[in-house]
Structures are given as C-alpha cells and as structure tokens.
C-alpha cells in the first residue's frame, strides 16, 4: 500500500493498493484514527505486538518524530490476514520540509521478511 498521509488531519490518500495486503476491508480506510482503531479493535495486529504498536503509532508520537526529529518511522509487526498473522512493515517518510504547515508524509505498508518463522 502506498499512500499520502496528513499528520494534522489523519487523512490518508491511497496512491496504490497491494492485493497481497487485502483483508477485512481495512485497506480502504481513509482516516488514520479509524485505520488504527480497526487494526487494534479487530485484533488485526497480533496481541503480543498490540501495546507497543498502540504507543508508537499514535498521531502525537508520529508528529513528534516527523516535525521535530525529522526522522522516518519503520515499524514491523504481525498483522492478521485471512491465512493468519504475517510480518508487515509500516513505513513513514517525511520530506525535509515536513511541518505543521506541510504535514504530508509518504506511507508504505508491505509484507516484511519474517524475523521469526514461528511467529
């Protein structure tokens, strides 16, 4: 999934969908807060990863990282698909001018090589 993501409004504009990430209709969400709530409430994030995911991926944490530290975020977690949980990467890339006035970042979500085949 390739999207533009607004760190102020939470709006997500999909540029390209990846059919391998399809499942449970979550790939059609356009609001970050709704997307995150569904991932957690529907246990689409593995229960062992949920607390860390919840703390790292809040809009406030992402704004701090993007606006002040000017760093990208790369987070790997186990996400549920119809066939079970698979390692997934969620990556956010700001440009050098990322700020409250220019809050757009690139979001990429893709399958990640498993670091532990037994999950």
Task: Annotate each PLM feature.
Residues 2, 62-64, 76, 94:
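Generic recognition of flexible, low-complexity loop/linker segments
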